[in-house]
Amino acid sequence: MDKIIDISNSKSKIFQNLLKYKAGDKEEGIFLAEGEDMFDEAYKSSSLLATIVPNIYDKRYVTKKTFHLKDELYRQLSSYKSLPKVICMCKKKMSDISSLGEKAIYLDGIQDPGNLGTIIRTALAFSYSSICLSYDCVSPYNSKVIQSSKGAIFHMPIIKEKLINIKKLNYNIFITSLDGEDEKNILSLPSKSILVFGNEGHGVKKENLSLGRKIKIEMSGIDSLNVAISASILMYRFK
């Protein structure tokens, strides 16, 4: 049976918890995702715990648990200039190293949430099996990551692990580096392969560079590309 909980006090414990979930990088195991498309993807992936709706709301977004907020409170939860019709309370689903699969992406120190969200979305589009993050990456549940992933965050296994531990599982590791060989030398990725992309400013960490075969995209006129663009090119190349 659907249940609507009215919240009108900004000091209420429930509302204060919702504000914590908005950050997405806390340890509560819950994050917020905004908009109709996110509602659909969260529902399909069984990640949806509850919905949050504004003062005037669409009954379509009333679920087993729905928080009904005054607009001034709803606005505090939203990152959008125009208020979305629904905000979804979702459960985090971090995977472990056993979920890497046959063809994965490793991100070493990625800091820009837009880059991470774009890479997650592209990896899903080109049928990569998982995204593995170093421990110093931006949180995959940052609101900007969620928005730029366009819902892909709900369908792509996300893992946090050290690259050295993946090496121990006998993965074929291909590391993007300015001093790498031309990626055209590789006809296709063998089974159990992982593509590694580094931090926007500093690239892959020094201690990780020796863990695999270094490759690069041959370019003329410039030294490097945005990491999300580089990742998209290579993911398409080796899909």
What would you call each of these model-derived segments?
Residues 94-180:
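RNA substrate-binding interface of SAM-dependent RNA methyltransferases
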Residues 66-94:
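Glycine/small-residue-rich loop that forms an oxyanion/phosphate-binding "nest" at active or ligand-binding sites
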Residues 61-74, 102, 171-173, 188-194, ...:
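Active-site regions of enzymes building and remodeling cell-envelope glycoconjugates
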Residues 122-126, 137-138, 142-154, 206-239:
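Structured adenosyl-cofactor binding patch, chiefly the S-adenosyl-L-methionine
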Residues 2-8, 67-70, 156-164:
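Short acidic-hydrophobic, aromatic-tinged amphipathic segments that line or gate anion-handling sites
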Residues 175-223:
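Active-site/ligand-binding-proximal alpha/beta "capping" segment
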